[in-house]
Amino acid sequence: MFKRFTVEEHVSSTSQIKNSVQRSIVNQISEQYPLLVDVIEQILPKKSMLIAKAQDNIQLVVVNNEVIFYNQMNGPFFPTLRLLHKYPTMMPKMQCDKGAVRFVLGGANIMAPGFTSAGGFVAESICVDTPVAIYAEGKQHAMAVGLTKMSRSDIFSVNKGIAVETVHYLMDGLWQTTSVQ
């Protein structure tokens, strides 16, 4: 999604949003990530939230010139990796084995065997279409954010096919975006 993303080429407009839209976004994010309820006012302060419209119907939620969350076609909101590194417990975790790391860092989707092999881990609460944080075996910080395409039980029983669609990963265009004006 953000492999070759740059603000100059892909963001068409940035605008201040109405308070009602702002409340709606905060409510959606609070509902989606209940562990952030205590700190949501710090993450998304009133009056400083902007929406940047990008290509492919992507909305970027910008606070203090930094992208905090994004979504595509009014789908679920995903945190950026910078925010996820500040609040690592905000979303369910999945860990892939060492063999999948270089492919994930290249933007590839993650196959089920990457989670079922020796270094893999899948959280109990994983359902289909759940935003998840992807960790590498033996590493402290998340390397990607993804959307599950299989439930936990399907990952272990089928053990083939795409388990997680990678939507944002370390060193992609969104990671390298330092500010949105």
Residue map of PLM features:
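Beta-strand/loop-dominated core regions that host nucleotide or nucleotide-derived cofactor-binding catalytic loops
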Residues: 2-58, 62-120, 125-126, 134-181
